[in-house]
Amino acid sequence: MNVAVGLGRLERDVTLATRFGHDHRGDAIASHTLASGVSLIDGAHNAPRTSSAKATLAADGSAEYDFDLVWDLGAQMVPRGGFFHVHTGSIGATLEPGASAVEAVLRREKALGASVSYDPNVRPIVMGRPSDVLEKIDALVSLSDIVKASDEDVSWLYPEKSLEEVTTRWLSLGVSLVVITQGVHGAQAKTGRETVVLPAAATTIADTIGAGDSFMSGMLSTLAHRSLLGTHASEALSAMTGEQLREVIAFALRCAAITVSRVGADPPRLADLG
């Protein structure tokens, strides 16, 4: 949801494929997404109950999560075609039975010309051990034009491999753009021909909830603005110059910096970015 909200606030036309109930949490989700300019698929608001995540903050603003989840999205609920890009990530892409529908939608829409992005955004408390989800994650990486992960995601999934080794492996699986975020240390991005490393944007940290999602929405928004998503995304992303890639990542880092300066997952609106 956070990526969709971030895109909506950046004035992108975005539809969220989700499921939640007619309860106080579900009604809050519906109001929040609508206020941020996000459309919902038909049937999104008719689940038996709304899943939830409780965030507990540490002294440094980092968060740990406790989840109460039901995920039963059906592929037939997601409209066929009409999207130039599809994004997925985290629990929704690995928790069954909904995860199989997510993968089916990605394969269907990619065959129809959409580009695909993926953020593993691991949640060990739900996903279990790395070995429980690696096959699914590798399949989703192989489907994707863009993969964004945090350094913490990578170290959990591949504890014996370096960031460079994992980045190189994902590129070898057909990904055109791999981005690794590193919290206060910024982010690194790599295509088949360019590598960019940028520091985090200066900010005061209130908490880190939603930072990665805000980075993702900022990156997708600026890639869309540059016509680098859609049918020819693989070629277009691979052809980016170092300066173009640097500008894309810098914008995403600015979005994340604004989000961590606020309490909760509160991504910026376009006007906040000047």
Spell out what each predicted region is.
Residues 85-168, 185-187:
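Conserved beta-alpha-beta core of the PfkB/ribokinase-like small-molecule kinase fold
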Residues 12-92, 111-114:
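Conserved N-terminal subdomain of the carbohydrate kinase-like
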